[in-house]
A protein has these predicted regions:
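Class I SAM-dependent methyltransferase "Motif I" SAM/SAH-binding loop
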Residues: 50-52
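A short acidic, Gly/Pro-enriched loop at the edge of an enzyme's catalytic core
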Residues: 106-115, 120
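A short glycine-rich, Lys/Arg-flanked "PGG" loop and its adjoining helix->strand segment in the class I
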Residues: 135-149
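Class I S-adenosyl-L-methionine
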Residues: 173-220
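S-adenosyl-L-methionine
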Residues: 83-110
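Single conserved hydrophobic/aromatic residue that forms the stacking wall/gate
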Residues: 1-15, 159
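Conserved SAM/SAH-binding beta-strand->alpha-helix loop
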Residues: 75
Length: 220
């Protein structure tokens, strides 16, 4: 079965890692059926990519019980903490899956996702790491395929480089729309509450060092 062995610890909301071969075969059993088969409802789905400990996914799920949340990370040991917290607090509208982010289009059907959060990803600053930036054109194209027509993407990062890089890409795209942009969300007013009310462990470390936190909300 697909449920991971960690389910034996009372964590039925963690799904095992899908191998690249399994996903590329196109036979992932929940593709196009996450809401119905996993969440047992028809609510919209929000993804958190590179979810780390799952802090953002869990808190967003707690605040938005009528939305389904899925955290994705290649390292399952990271989000085990988030899954445990969700289990302890009976937050049943958040799940986690261990998978490579570049394979999202094999995990989800076209138009299956309503919103994406990318929180504090590695900015991959060197040129040779461009292909690994989670907001490069190739990744944006993958996100566009799984987002519905009104779907949006949120990028929250301490990297002014990644913030500027992403804005530059969006401004050069024909159909992209920047809904909100702020290069220092805690110093400048007007930030969406979901961008400032939830702080991850690492975000608090950045803030303690007076590092600005940037945020962009956009459509593609």
């Amino acid at each position: 079965g697909i449920r991971d062995s960690v389910a034996s610890r009372g964590l039925g909301d963690v799904y095992k890692r899908q191998t690249r071969e399994e996903l590329l075969s196109g036979n992932f059993e929940f593709k196009g059926r996450w809401a119905k088969k996993v969440f047992n409802n028809s609510n919209p789905i929000t993804l958190e990519l590179g979810c780390g400990k799952g802090e953002y996914s869990v808190e967003l799920a707690r605040q938005n019980p009528d939305v389904n949340f899925i955290g994705i990370d290649i390292k399952g040991a990271r989000f085990w903490r988030g899954a445990k917290t969700a289990n302890e607090k009976n937050i049943d509208n958040v799940k986690f899956i261990r998978a490579q982010i570049e394979l999202v289009e094999y995990l989800f059907e076209k138009n299956e996702i309503s919103e994406i959060w990318i929180t504090f990803p590695d900015p991959q600053i060197t040129f040779k790491r461009t292909k690994h930036r989670l907001t490069n054109l190739e990744f944006l194209d993958k996100y566009k395929r799984i987002l519905n027509i009104n779907g949006c993407i949120n990028l929250k990062t301490d990297s002014e480089f990644l913030h500027g890089y992403t804005i530059g890409l969006l401004q050069a795209m024909n159909n992209a729309e920047i809904l909100y942009s702020n290069h220092d969300i805690y110093k400048r007013s007007g930030s969406p509450k979901e961008a400032i009310e939830i702080k991850t462990h690492y975000e608090n470390l950045f803030l303690n060092n007076d590092k600005p936190i940037t945020f962009i909300k956009f459509k593609i």
